[in-house]
């Protein structure tokens, strides 16, 4: 079946849908209503009218691959999963990529990268949604799909990922006026707050929660303290810091921080301290697109990325904020710095030629002795 909701279109969409319904070989329900101001309302209307075993939310700008629904339903039926992600490709716009490395017949939100795709364009088992009375939050003007999809991931009995077939074509509008790009900065904080609260409600404090909290901190909150922050006036800066502080106080942990790059961790920490001045200095440095100096302590052999205010006696910033983690890859002079993917903080320096090389501190002495070629952190 197709349930098409015309949310107050003024371009003849309603008439086109009704004409399509008359000649369609499958059941088509057309609902015409006044414009609701966002996607949540029409999605909820369509969801309540749906009667199939599965539902899929298709946005007006986009389209499906010819075999998309067939393949996704078959995947869910074969493996008994409640949510299926079909590979998304961008048309005149970018699309998420990191979760499409390989097809996963059965996974979950904790052991995959699906937390980085929270749009509503997934196949959902309708029984999952009705059993938990799941609907889109119409009070949110942005990020409502992230809240809905994350809840589905957390409640699902398994999630499947189809990576070997282009299921969904995410089409960029020529005018750039996508609903998800509208609204002021306060709406982004509303979205981050709601998503963090949902995760905290469903997942006890610990490594699993920290792993999920990376998503709202990195994708929703942190952009507010990116390049746009330098353009904000003082009043907006103060407001953003005030909005962020309760979330940082409640959900920002060392476990979340250790999963972010140094510059990301610095920005969140400085926002939590309310230090717009120090944050601006870091952003000015990032704007120059230069790699930070690599500082290796000659005594402890600990390594740091020396962003602005590293060991600045006038700034209350601990050295630990500057320690690189496994997400960090920085090219420094003739070296490519790439910490191993390990839980502990450790890294090596590998020159472009491939042979191990020492870390040399400012004093000029090798940072390792004998055969130990790793600067320990």
Q: Could you tell me what each predicted segment is?
A:
Residues 165-173, 179-207, 220-224, 230-251:
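Catalytic core of nucleotide-sugar-dependent glycosyltransferases
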Residues 51, 123-124, 213-226:
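Solvent-exposed aromatic/hydrophobic patches embedded in short alpha-helical segments
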Residues 186, 212, 333-336:
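Short, solvent-exposed segments of well-ordered alpha helices
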Residues 230-377:
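Basic, ligand-binding patches in group-transfer machinery
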Residues 206-214:
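All-alpha amphipathic helical-bundle segments outside canonical DNA-binding/catalytic cores
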Residues 1-191, 229, 340, 346-347:
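Nucleotide-sugar donor-binding/catalytic module of glycosyltransferases
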Residues 85-88, 136-147, 194-198, 217-228, ...:
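A short, terminal or domain-edge coil/loop segment
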Residues 61, 84, 124, 170, ...:
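Generic structural hydrophobic/aromatic packing signal, biased to beta-strands
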């Amino acid at each position: 079946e197709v349930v098409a909701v015309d949310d107050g279109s003024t371009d003849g969409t309603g008439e086109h849908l009704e004409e399509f319904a008359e000649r369609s070989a499958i059941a088509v329900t057309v609902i015409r209503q006044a414009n609701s101001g966002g996607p949540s309302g029409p999605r909820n209307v369509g969801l309540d009218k749906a009667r199939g075993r599965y539902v899929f939310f298709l946005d007006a700008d986009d389209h499906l691959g010819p075999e998309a629904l067939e393949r996704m339903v078959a995947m869910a039926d074969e493996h008994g999963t409640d949510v299926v992600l079909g590979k998304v490709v961008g048309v005149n716009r970018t699309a998420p990529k990191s979760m499409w490395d390989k097809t996963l017949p059965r996974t979950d939100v904790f052991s995959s990268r699906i937390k980085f795709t929270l749009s509503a364009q997934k196949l959902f088992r309708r029984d999952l949604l009705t059993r938990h009375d799941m609907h889109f939050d119409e009070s949110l003007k942005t990020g409502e799909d992230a809240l809905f999809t994350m809840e589905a991931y957390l409640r699902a009995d398994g999630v499947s990922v189809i990576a070997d077939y282009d299921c969904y074509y995410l089409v960029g509008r020529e005018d750039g006026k996508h609903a998800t790009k509208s609204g002021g900065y306060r709406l982004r904080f509303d979205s981050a707050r709601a998503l963090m609260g949902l995760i905290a409600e469903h997942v006890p404090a610990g490594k699993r929660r920290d792993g999920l909290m990376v998503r709202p901190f990195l994708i929703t909150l942190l952009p507010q303290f990116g390049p746009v922050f330098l353009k904000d006036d003082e009043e907006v800066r103060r407001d953003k810091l005030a909005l962020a502080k309760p979330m940082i106080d409640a959900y920002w942990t060392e476990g979340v921080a250790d999963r972010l790059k140094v510059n990301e961790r610095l920005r969140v920490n400085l926002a939590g301290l309310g230090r717009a001045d120090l944050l601006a200095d870091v952003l000015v440095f990032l704007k120059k697109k230069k790699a930070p100096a690599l500082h290796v302590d000659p005594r402890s052999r600990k390594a740091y990325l020396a962003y602005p205010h590293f060991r600045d006696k006038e700034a209350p910033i601990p050295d630990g904020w500057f320690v690189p983690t496994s997400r960090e890859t920085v090219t420094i002079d003739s070296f490519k710095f790439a910490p191993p993917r390990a839980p502990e903080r450790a890294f090596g320096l590998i020159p472009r030629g491939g042979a191990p090389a020492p870390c040399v501190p400012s004093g000029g002495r090798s940072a390792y002795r004998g055969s130990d070629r790793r600067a320990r952190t």
